[in-house]
């Protein structure tokens, strides 16, 4: 991105300011250049300038540490001015009132406006008496007698700033306010442990009572089924264990009776089969007897059947 030439009008005449190229990915150590003839070019403190690109985009510039002597307008070349390397990154700081829009150039400046001091490229170096390339210049922003760049940082460290319209610049001094609590915080109130224990105990007692009632009802039903037990004996104080014992005896007796009856049933089935066989034999004998009688009558023999009684 190429810098754009700016013109600043003062009482003494018109001065041309040539801005250099901004750092790109090809040369990460390069810095923004603003080279002029001398620091005395702008004797009028009301002179303003605007950094602006051709397409209205953002402008990247680099902060150079300048000694107090240079800030006070001493002779060029005196004092140490060190540049911060472009490869080091720090926390970005936003300077309030450091940038102005295009419309602000035509307005009258006030005492609180930002003024800029320029130093030639010969005054910029890595140490005392050292110089860098001829296209490098130091740019220091001051407001009154106080520097808006904040506290001075040691040499060898620096940061980059992005120049944009004042509407897009965040106010450095503004802080985000947190809404106060509408009501005092109260920890979650928990019911006493004794109350929970009592509630659980009451529920347990209710369950146990229902279970006992069911058992008592079943025992009463058993006492009605068992022949030896009766309601009178139960009312007289017969224990539940006695009723259960008699119920067990009765169940055993019923099982034995069932087994005996099953055996007798098998014997009856066998007798039934034998009876059927004998009945069939009796029928056969009767039929044979009838045939013999018929033969006797055919031959003229009279058969007299005598009963046992006779």
UniProtKB/Swiss-Prot annotation:
Record's compositionally biased regions (Basic and acidic residues): 190-209
PANTHER family recorded: FI24210P1 (PTHR46117), UPSTREAM STIMULATORY FACTOR 1 (PTHR46117:SF1)
InterPro entries named in the record: bHLH_dom, HLH_DNA-bd_sf, USF
Protein name in UniProt: Upstream stimulatory factor 1
GO cellular component terms, A-Z: chromatin; Golgi apparatus; nucleoplasm; transcription regulator complex
Chain spans, region Leucine-zipper: 271-292
Subunit structure: Efficient DNA binding requires dimerization with another bHLH protein. Binds DNA as a homodimer or a heterodimer (USF1/USF2).
UniProt cross-link Glycyl lysine isopeptide (Lys-Gly) (interchain with G-Cter in SUMO2), position: 306
Segments of skewed composition (Polar residues): 1-17
Organism: Bos taurus (Bovine)
Keyword annotations from UniProtKB, A to Z: DNA-binding, Isopeptide bond, Nucleus, Transcription, Transcription regulation, Ubl conjugation
Ranges for domain bHLH: 199-254
Gene Ontology MF annotations: bHLH transcription factor binding; DNA-binding transcription activator activity, RNA polymerase II-specific; DNA-binding transcription factor activity, RNA polymerase II-specific; histone deacetylase binding; protein heterodimerization activity; protein homodimerization activity; protein kinase binding; protein-containing complex binding
Function: Transcription factor that binds to a symmetrical DNA sequence (E-boxes) (5'-CACGTG-3') that is found in a variety of viral and cellular promoters.
The keyword Metal-binding appears for this protein: no
UniProt GO BP: cellular response to insulin stimulus; glucose mediated signaling pathway; late viral transcription; lipid homeostasis; positive regulation of transcription from RNA polymerase II promoter by glucose; regulation of transcription by RNA polymerase II; response to hypoxia; response to UV
UniProt-annotated location(s): Nucleus
Annotated segments matching region Disordered: 1-26, 171-209
SUPFAM superfamilies, per the entry: HLH, helix-loop-helix DNA-binding domain
């Amino acid at each position: 991105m190429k810098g754009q030439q700016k013109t600043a009008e003062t009482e003494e005449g018109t001065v041309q300011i040539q801005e250099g190229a901004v750092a790109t990915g090809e040369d990460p150590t390069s810095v923004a250049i603003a080279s002029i003839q001398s620091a005395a070019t702008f004797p009028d403190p009301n002179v303003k300038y605007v950094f602006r690109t051709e397409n209205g985009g953002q402008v990247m510039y680099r902060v150079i540490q300048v000694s107090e002597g240079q800030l006070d307008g001493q002779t060029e070349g005196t004092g140490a001015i060190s540049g911060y390397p472009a490869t080091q990154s720090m926390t970005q700081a936003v300077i309030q009132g450091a940038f102005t829009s295009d419309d602000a150039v035509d307005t009258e400046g006030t005492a609180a406006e930002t003024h800029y001091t320029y130093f030639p490229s010969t005054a910029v170096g890595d140490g005392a008496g050292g110089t860098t390339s001829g296209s490098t210049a130091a740019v220091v922003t001051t407001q009154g007698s106080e520097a808006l760049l904040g506290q001075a940082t040691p040499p060898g460290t620096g940061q980059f700033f992005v120049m944009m319209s004042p509407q897009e610049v965040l106010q450095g001094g503004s802080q985000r306010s947190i809404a106060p609590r509408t009501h005092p915080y109260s920890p979650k109130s928990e019911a006493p442990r004794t109350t929970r224990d009592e509630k659980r105990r009451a529920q347990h007692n209710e369950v146990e009572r229902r279970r006992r009632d069911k058992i008592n009802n079943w025992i009463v039903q058993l006492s009605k089924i068992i022949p030896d037990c009766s309601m009178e004996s139960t009312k007289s104080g017969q224990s539940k264990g006695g009723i259960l014992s008699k119920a067990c005896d009765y169940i055993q007796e019923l099982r034995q009776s069932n087994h005996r009856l099953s055996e007798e049933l098998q014997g009856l089935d066998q007798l039934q089969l034998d009876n059927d066989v004998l009945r069939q034999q009796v029928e056969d004998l009767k039929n044979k007897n009838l045939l013999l009688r018929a033969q006797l009558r055919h031959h003229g023999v009279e058969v007299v059947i005598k009963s046992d009684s006779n």
